[in-house]
């Protein structure tokens, strides 16, 4: 099992992740990408995972350049068309624990390699109070920013399913952005409607592409819903 926090330079890994995911044989490896959307533990520097117009230490918001220029890197979807014979790919959000646990169980049971991208709040880098972490995480999916979906590759053919978060709710999206200090320059001293609309537009473009992929490569039952009785889970043994 590999833990990956930064994915803008996958070639920095000692064993290349893309090489493992491309292997045809049985390969029981799970990569978990905890996506905090920047190089957080080294100083909140911008990365490929940073969303548009977010302020970081290497791309601070100013009068001329309002934060990051460019879109957030899509990590999960391209792997579905990587040519691998068997893969399990998914996005998760801890604000939806049943979905997260169900996907992690499926990933660990997969005969092939698995890659799970987790929405990972960082109160220091995102500039918000600690007690708002779960609220913000839930808003991320509810507003359409962080959709929850799965790609199961069998014999090289991807099959898409989703749980929620593909439809944009503009009011919730604005609330989501406003809840974090990394976007405060979009609201103060003036309301930067053009930049906010661009973030929503880029996100909607991505979600529309996902909808088309689900339509073209979707399962017979495209909605993925996990029912987990957490009371029946065995207690963890810590040694």
What annotation goes with each model-predicted range?
Residues 27-32, 37, 77, 86-90, ...:
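Structural motif
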Residues 27, 85, 142-146:
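Structural alpha-beta junctions
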Residues 1-46, 95-102, 107:
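Thiamine diphosphate
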Residues 15-19, 46-51, 130-135:
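Short secondary-structure boundary/capping segments
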Residues 120-239:
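Flexible, low-complexity linker and terminal segments
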Residues 48-110:
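Conserved thiamine diphosphate
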Residues 93-130, 134-136:
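ATP/pyrophosphate-binding catalytic subdomain of soluble kinases
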């Amino acid at each position: 099992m590999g833990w990956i926090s930064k994915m803008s330079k996958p070639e920095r890994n000692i064993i290349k992740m893309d090489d493992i995911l491309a292997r045809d044989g049985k390969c029981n490896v799970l990569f978990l990408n905890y996506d905090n959307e920047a190089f957080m533990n080294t100083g909140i520097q911008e990365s490929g995972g940073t969303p548009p117009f977010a302020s970081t230490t290497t791309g601070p918001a100013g009068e001329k350049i309002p934060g990051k220029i460019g879109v957030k890197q899509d990590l999960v979807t391209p792997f579905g068309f990587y040519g691998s014979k068997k893969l399990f790919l998914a996005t998760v959000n801890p604000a939806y624990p049943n979905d997260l646990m169900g996907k992690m169980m499926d990933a660990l049971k997969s005969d092939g390699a698995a890659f799970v991208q987790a929405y990972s709040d960082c109160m220091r880098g995102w500039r918000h109070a600690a007690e708002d972490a779960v609220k913000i995480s839930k808003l991320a999916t509810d507003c359409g920013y962080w959709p929850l979906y799965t790609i199961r590759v069998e014999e090289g053919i991807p099959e898409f399913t989703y749980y929620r978060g593909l439809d944009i709710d503009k009011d919730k999206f604005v609330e989501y952005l406003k809840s974090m200090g990394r976007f405060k320059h979009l609201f103060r001293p003036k309301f930067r409607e053009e930049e906010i609309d661009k973030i929503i537009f880029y996100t909607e473009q991505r979600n529309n592409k996902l909808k088309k992929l689900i339509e073209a490569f979707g399962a017979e039952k495209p909605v993925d819903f996990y029912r987990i009785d957490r009371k029946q889970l065995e207690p963890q043994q810590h040694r």
